[in-house]
From Swiss-Prot:
Coiled-coil portions: none
Full protein name: Multifunctional tryptophan biosynthesis protein
Active site (record annotation): 104, 198, 200
Task performed by this protein: Trifunctional enzyme bearing the Gln amidotransferase (GATase) domain of anthranilate synthase, indole-glycerolphosphate synthase, and phosphoribosylanthranilate isomerase activities.
EC number, UniProt record: 4.1.3.27, 4.1.1.48, 5.3.1.24
Length: 762
């Protein structure tokens, strides 16, 4: 191009365009290039709110936490594979989530990320202006052909290695009309574009138009962008000065659009299609559920607690990325939460349906467990069915997001699956909608979803509209016990707390202070005396003597061919001796305790302790039918499985099951099956367990309690248990067989000595 045709296309009017709502948090990655300023200038002039980070001054997690609306990768020196810092990782993460635009090296990063080769372009082009041909789409929409654009590069992506997922969008035409060096690429599915030239150069024509087109792109895919653009155009066409507030606005609109695209895509995956989910539900494989309303009304606190699991939010970014959902849920449950709310939205809240599934699993077998809430942007019956199959007891329906017809349809569908939804409102209009719907549980969001401002008085002001039999929850901004007292004063029945608990160093202590106003460490319950099991019993006399000495469990061996196996008549006489000694009295627990969740092993230990003395039948690798027959025949109170029997057998046996494990064996801490795990070195081997391995086992799960067996005798039982240190509190009982024998026969004196010694431990 001759010097006479050189035109200065730089912005002569420095007044920026009106802010683009969809470009409110654009992040520009600076690859240490002077042109980055010009890119920044053009973006701001076209209405974007831009923050710049150099490519080695921010981590990917920090970048994710910024929750950008768009991502722009700047030009830069060097090769994208070695000199682009975080740029390529940023493209990988945000691809399919938000619009991405790459300039010069930025385009080369896109090319490289998807497997193309970036190499020498055939000539060094620094300041060369060339006429650009383009496809008129995306960033080039509405722009003329043969635009003069300026090039500053010696590298470029090659035609022969063009990744399958990318298409060429612009090029410098050769004299024969064929396509020359690639000047632009676009991802075929994701909202990603790149240009090799510099639209921000003063010698490039219509550069601002390219940036303007990019800033108005929305969503992570072209399909999503098209849908949102049509929706925006339709809304603009129908907008009147007196029009009501749209149902979906600002961040809600963005999240809704993203989730809609994700759900639509998921429905196409074999095994996750709507028909697949319905087939699974028809087989009744969804976990058992409980009533949301009943669980909320059965709270240990004056104001019921819905404790939330979320790692991030649109307003606060990432704040608890490393917390795992099931561990946190167990803390919530045992601290008194009535509901556990699980965020399952992956991009803005960093959750997933797998979090909910894991939370439900960790609550298995827990008496008075909390209800599980799927907190998600629900707009489709598919999401509700998916939640039920994962173990949810309830789902969230946000009135602001849903037209009444859809809201009512989703509400009724949830009820058809046995789930009373939590219906979220924010103002009087939405509250009236929820009441019209017939919602039994209504949550008032104290946070304005458009401004993110919190007003704790919102719930109280809406209380007068709520029927007396409707459960009312405050959903945001609760941080202190005084906040809870204020809610109670305003007639609020429950609170939902998320970020404050997730940030707390000790979730259990935080809940105690928040809900009950109690400070200081959680008091420990007095340690119960050790349970004592005398096993290998071969006479009614020995059984009676063991019970007289204070034994809680009397075991007899039911394994044919073993030296301690008893015959039919002896088994009957032992059974009679044990059952004639049964304790009498109430086994009720306090009404306060019944309102809190209990760990499965903890409650079973209490039940066994209250019902003793109990008769235990020991089996090893025998048919289930034989176990069931002998349990009935000898009126066994407990069945002990000492072999390789499946865990599931415990649910087929009509009495509690004690199951033998070695330290480190899989399944020991699995809830909902065996009532108590028994740690043993071997079947009557008389060999002491390796106590270090016992400690490691107990340290894995702070709620697991065990019976201890193997090599115990009157002279070492006290020392063995106490050598476990603080972990000894988790040993609820000891089991002895050969340790109370002399000459292969049970010694009544040793039985008495063992019981006395064991009971002296605590």
């Amino acid at each position: 191009m001759s010097s006479s045709s050189v035109v200065d296309h730089s912005p002569h009017d420095s007044a920026p365009s009106p802010l683009v709502p969809t470009a409110s948090n654009l992040i520009l990655i600076d690859n240490y290039d002077s042109f980055t300023w010009n890119v920044y200038q053009y973006l701001v002039l076209e209405g974007a709110k831009v923050t710049v980070f150099r490519n080695d001054q921010i981590t990917i997690d920090e970048l994710i936490a910024k929750n950008p609306t768009q991502l722009v990768i700047s030009p830069g020196p060097g090769h994208p594979g070695t000199d682009s810092g975080i740029s390529r990782d940023a493209i990988r993460h945000f691809a399919g989530k938000i619009p991405i635009f790459g300039v010069c090296m930025g385009q080369q990063c896109i090319f490289d990320v998807y497997g193309g080769d970036v190499c020498f372009a055939g000539e060094i082009l620094h300041g060369k202006t060339s006429p650009l041909r383009h496809d008129g789409k995306g960033a080039y929409a509405g722009l003329s052909q043969d635009l003069p654009v300026t090039r500053y590069h010696s590298l470029a992506g090659t035609h022969v290695t063009l990744p399958e997922c990318l298409e060429v969008t612009s090029w410098i035409a050769k004299e024969d009309g064929s396509k020359g060096v690639i000047m632009g690429v676009r991802h075929k599915e994701y909202t990603i574009e790149g240009v090799q030239f510099h639209p921000e150069s003063i010698l490039s024509a219509e550069g601002r138009g390219m940036f303007r087109n990019f800033l108005h792109m929305q969503g992570g895919t072209w399909a999503e962008n098209e849908r949102l653009q049509k929706a925006a155009q339709a809304q603009a066409a129908n907008t009147k000065s007196d029009a009501p507030t749209p149902k979906k606005s600002n961040i809600l609109q963005k999240i809704y659009a993203h989730r809609k695209a994700a759900v639509d895509a998921q429905k196409q995956i074999p095994s996750l299609r709507p028909s697949d989910l319905q087939a699974a539900y028809n087989l009744s494989i969804a976990p058992p559920q409980i009533s949301l309303v009943d669980r909320l009304r059965n709270s240990p606190f004056d104001v019921a607690l819905c404790a939330e699991i979320k790692r991030a939010s649109p307003s606060k970014g990432v704040f608890a990325l490393d917390i795992d959902a099931p561990s946190q849920a167990r803390k919530y449950a045992l601290a008194g939460a009535s509901v556990i709310s699980v965020l399952t939205e992956p991009e803005w809240f960093k959750g997933s349906i797998d979090d909910l599934r894991a939370v439900r699993q960790v609550l298995n077998g827990m008496p008075n467990r909390p209800a599980v809430l799927r907190k998600e942007f629900i707009f489709d019956e598919y999401q509700i069915l998916e939640a039920r199959l994962a173990g949810a007891d309830t789902v969230l329906l946000i009135v602001k997001m849903l037209e009444y017809e859809l809201l009512e349809r989703l509400y009724k569908y949830s009820l058809s699956l046995g789930m009373e939804p939590l219906v979220e409102v924010q103002n009087t209009e939405e509250m009236a909608t929820a009441i019209k719907l017939g919602a039994k549980v209504i949550g008032v969001n104290n946070r304005n979803l458009e401004s993110f401002e919190v007003d704790l008085g919102t719930t109280g002001r809406l209380r007068s509209m709520v029927p007396s039999d409707t459960f009312l929850c405050a959903l945001s901004g609760i941080n202190t016990h005084q906040d809870v007292l204020d809610c109670k004063r305003d007639g609020v029945n429950g609170i939902l707390v998320g970020e404050a608990i997730m940030r707390a160093p000790d979730a259990t202590q935080f809940i105690r202070e928040l809900c009950a106003g109690l400070t200081g460490p959680v008091p420990k319950s007095a340690a119960e005396p050790l349970l004592v099991k005398i096993c290998g019993t071969r006479s009614a006399e020995a059984a009676a003597e063991a019970i007289k000495a204070g034994a809680d469990l009397v075991g007899m061996i039911m394994v044919p061919g073993t030296k301690r196996c008893v015959d039919h008549e002896t088994a009957l006489s032992i059974s009679q001796a044990v059952h004639m000694s049964k304790k009498t009295g109430s086994t009720e627990v306090s009404s306060q305790a019944s309102k809190s969740a209990r760990d499965f092993f903890n409650i079973n230990a209490e039940i066994i302790r209250k019902r003793g003395p109990l008769l235990v039948g020991v089996f090893m690798n025998q048919p289930l039918e034989e176990v069931l027959e002998k349990q009935h025949l000898y009126d066994l109170d407990i069945v002990q499985l000492h072999g390789d029997e499946p865990l599931e057998w415990a649910n087929l046996i009509p009495v509690p099951v004690v199951r033998k494990f070695k330290p480190g064996q899989v399944g020991l801490a699995t809830r909902g099956y065996h009532a108590v795990p028994l740690l043993d070195s071997g079947a009557g081997s008389g060999t002491l367990l390796d106590l270090e391995s016992v400690k490691k086992e107990l340290e894995k799960d702070e709620q697991v309690t065990v019976l201890l067996a193997g090599g115990l005798e009157p002279s070492n039982v006290v020392e063995t248990v106490k050598s476990l240190g603080p972990l000894s509190e988790r040993v609820i009982g000891v089991d002895v067989s050969s340790g109370v024998e002399e000459g292969g026969k049970q010694s009544l004196e040793k039985i008495r000595e063992f019981v006395k010694a064991a009971k002296s431990v605590r």
